[in-house]
Each structure stands twice: as structure tokens, then as C-alpha cells.
Amino acid sequence: MAVRGILGRQRREYRTPEPHPSGARPPKLGDLVPEHVAIVMDGNGRWAKERGLPRTEGHKVGAEQVMDVLQGAIEMGVGNISLYAFSTENWKRSPEEVRFLMNFNRDFIRKSRDTLDELGVRVRWAGRMPRLWKSVAKELQVAQEQTKDNDRLTLYFCMNYGGRAEIADAAQALAEDVRAGKLDPAKVNEKTLAKYLYYPDMPDVDLFLRPSGEQRTSNYLLWQSAYAEMVFQDVLWPDFDRRDLWRACLEFASRDRRFGGAIPNEELLAMEGRSTR
């Protein structure tokens, strides 16, 4: 069954996600579905090494999982997915791997944008322009323009991105407005700075998901992940599919999110009562 979305004043039909080959269906979480899931696609190199293959093969297989995960997110009802495709630190890798990743990401975006558009995915690129290959930036801009009116799922494709870099860029832009007399420094607060981020309307991250067994943020969406629930899985990204995303969403739904607030006194008393029995 196709879903209708809005394109200008007209309505269009979005393509129904293809079911998983196993026949698995997403769990029903109702209001507990995370609105924004940030994913660190980690483990491509280790996956390839375990099989005696070059690192590039891990990246190729890992890319095949992206579309499956996005379709699983649509089935689940997730509104926003952020994918860490290439970080500002990845330039430290060998010239051969950097060249491969630039070419690969450019080709992936070009080949995928029509399918993403049909699925109702809005593509947004987050990252720095300097150093990024012009051919990659062009494909990202074309994908953004083609999908800008889609409203089923927003995909933030983080390319040449770093969390500290984003905050530094925001601070620089804010400082320039202060110097130009457009902004009173005495009135600067968190909300003010947030307006200078790459996408001020990006929802805060609810679920920060990292496969591969590593347990760190790797400088990813630092501002937006202030109160994110962290879920780390041992599966390597090339073996990751929508079922792993669903399992992470189930884990998220079981968490007690207080956003820095205290546990109510009655809950504390109940916990103390249980601990003394």
C-alpha cells in the first residue's frame, strides 16, 4: 500500500518499503518510537579483515545495508535518521582509502537518490564544504533539491562532518554577528547558539546507535546527543540490518528518560524498600 505525501500543492504516492526477506515485522512501540536515530556505521574494515578481503569490500557491503535500514525505519515510524558517512577525522586515513570513500559515497548518492525519493525520504547533507570533493558536494546538493518536499523520513547524510567542527562553525558565525552588531552578546544562550548549527530544526537525537562493539561517540552530533540514549551492539555494520535497528528501538523503549530530572520521591522510597527486603 502506497502512502501519500505532499509535494507543493499536489499529493504524491510514496513507494511501500520492501519487506525483509525473513518476513520479520517491526515491533509496535506506539509513542515510544524514537523520533531521531543517529547511527555510526562502524565495523566495515574489521568485517573485511575477518574474511581476508580489502577494506574497500567492507564499505561496499556496508552500503548495501543502508537502504534496508532506512526501509526498516520507515516501517517502524522513525521520523529522522542520521548516518555518519565520513568524518572530519577520516582525512587521516590512507590517500587510497580516502579516494575510494569519496568516489564511493558520490556514486552511492547518485544511484540511490531516485529510490530514496520514491520512498518519501528527504535527504539533507550535514558537514563542511572545505576539502569535500566538488563532485560529492554536487551529488548531495542534487539529492537535496530532488527530495526537499518529501515528508516521510528525513535522512541526514553526514559527510565531512564532525561534532566539534559543527559547534566551532556555529560559534564563529555567531561571533561574526556579534561583531557586526546584529547580536547582543549578553543575550547569547543555548537557544541562540543552536540557531547557528547546520540544521537548527534538526530534532535532538533520541537514540544513538553504534554497531561493531565500540562504545564511544567518535565526535558525532555532540550537541544534538546531549540526552540521547546510547545503544551499542556487537554486530559489524555489513551484517547489520533493519532487525538490529528494531532491537535497538526496543531497548530504547525500555529506558527511563528523565532528561536530568530526579526520580520522584515515592519511586526512591519504593526502591529503598525493595533493597532492604
Swiss-Prot record:
Enumerate the PROSITE patterns for this protein. UPP_SYNTHASE (PS01066)
GO:BP terms for this protein?
polyprenol biosynthetic process
Q: Which Pfam families match?
A: Prenyltransf
Q: What SUPFAM superfamilies would the database entry show?
A: Undecaprenyl diphosphate synthase (SSF64005)
**Record-listed substrate binding positions:** 43-47, 55, 59, 87-89, 91, 93, 210, 216-218
Q: Which GO terms describe its molecular function?
A: ditrans,polycis-undecaprenyl-diphosphate synthase [(2E,6E)-farnesyl-diphosphate specific] activity; magnesium ion binding; manganese ion binding; Z-farnesyl diphosphate synthase activity
> For the region Disordered, what residue ranges are annotated?
1-30
Q: How are cofactors bound according to the entry's free-text note?
A: Binds 2 magnesium ions per subunit.
Q: Name one GO cellular component term.
A: plasma membrane
Residue positions annotated to bind Mg(2+) are D42, E229
Q: Which CDD domains match?
A: Cis_IPPS
Query: Which leading EC class covers this enzyme?
Result: transferase
Database matches in InterPro entries: UPP_synth-like, UPP_synth-like_CS, UPP_synth-like_sf
- Sorted alphabetically, which HAMAP family does this protein's record hold? ISPT (MF_01139)
Q: What is known about what this protein does? A: Catalyzes the condensation of isopentenyl diphosphate (IPP) with allylic pyrophosphates generating different type of terpenoids.
Record note on quaternary structure: Homodimer.
* Entry-linked NCBIfam families: PRK14829.1, uppS
Please state what the protein is called: Isoprenyl transferase 1
Q: What gene makes this protein?
A: uppS1
